[in-house]
Amino acid sequence: NGEVSAIFSNIDGIQDNKFSGPHPSGNVGVQIHHIDPIAKGDIVWTVSPYGVAQIGKLFSKGIYDASKLVAVAGSEVQEPQYYKTFIGASINKLVDGNLKQDHVRFISGNVLTGEKIDKDGYLGFYDNLLTVIPEGDQPEFLGWIKPQKERLSFHRAWGLFSFLNGKNKEYALDSNTNGEARAFVQTGTFEQVTPMDIYPTYLIKAIMAEDYDNMEALGIFEVIEEDLALCEFIDVSKHDIQHIVRDGLELLQNG
């Protein structure tokens, strides 16, 4: 917003870059790619505005500020809201009495990159969001074969008539993957959700084949898990794309 922009515009010694658009335009990896792509041997440090404030308070006042503002949201939260709490706080009190049902999935972070936690679990160190969605372990008659429009489908296979709802339709998605891992099917859709000058399909296949040369040539140094999270979400082959990316990065680091 304007207030935030004014804060950053008044800081000396920085380069102010603005980005807009749908996810993943807010990912730092995508932004770095368009400002100054990472090459082999480069070291890039990133820090959030919240982290800057923590560091500033530590050095200016000698105080480590462990407080954080946490958003509790998701389709199964009755009243989504913000809570002021501390790093490592249990989520139990954040959701007590504020759920639409008990059979839910708690996620530390967002639905694309977050981690499953229990109701008596804790938010991750870097997470400022607790997401609550339906668990999604209930069997459904005919599954994805059943024509319907109440299911989101990027490929118009599951939820065949979902396009009739228009682009602004909101869906209450659950944790069901609607299938198991299968052969890698190339559909050309990964490139549609990756706003970077790379070929994610071929990069992922190079990682799976442990082909170091092609991994480097296809842009492994420019991505981390969150940058290809949408690829995992729309993958008809049901592969754990983010885990594959992490394996590739560790292969290069340890290789």
Show where each model-derived region lies:
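Buried, small/hydrophobic-residue-enriched core segments of structured protein domains
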Residues: N1-G255
